[in-house]
């Protein structure tokens, strides 16, 4: 238990991680309808978006990378929903396997885009991934 309770913790993150989080929050703003949940989503989105606007100079390259990241995260959202439906129906056949593989490949692409954002912005923090080759 924290003795000094804080309502938020400030942590430095890479620019790619910030873009990723904001893109996911934008998707949540569109997908989630529960008003109480939406309030928390909007509050977090506004806080993070303000940091992005205040700390980064917008340009076409970064905007394109953000859009690509959001597109990947949107696809992941749909695939995760479909995979949960397979789980609910105990359907672990070809569709489930394809969805699982799609998540794997999209997450690799997502990591690549985040690294490119970090490189483009000179982010001092970079998320480094290493996986078994396939």
Predicted features along the sequence, with ranges:
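Short, Lys/Arg-enriched N-terminal segments with co-localized hydrophobic residues
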Residues: 1-5
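Anionic, Ser/Thr-rich low-complexity intrinsically disordered regions
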Residues: 6-134
């Amino acid at each position: 238990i924290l003795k000094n309770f804080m309502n938020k913790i400030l942590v430095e993150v890479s620019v790619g991680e910030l873009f990723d989080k904001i893109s996911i929050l934008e998707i949540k703003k569109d997908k989630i309808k529960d008003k109480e949940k939406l309030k928390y989503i909007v509050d977090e989105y506004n806080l993070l978006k303000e940091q992005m606007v205040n700390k980064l100079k917008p340009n076409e390259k970064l905007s394109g990378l953000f859009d690509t990241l959001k597109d990947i995260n949107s696809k992941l959202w749909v695939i995760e929903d479909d995979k949960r439906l397979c789980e609910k129906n105990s359907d672990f056949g070809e569709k489930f396997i394809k969805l699982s593989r799609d998540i794997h490949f999209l997450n690799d692409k997502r990591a690549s885009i985040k690294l490119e954002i970090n490189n483009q912005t000179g982010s001092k923090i970079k998320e480094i991934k290493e996986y078994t080759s396939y």
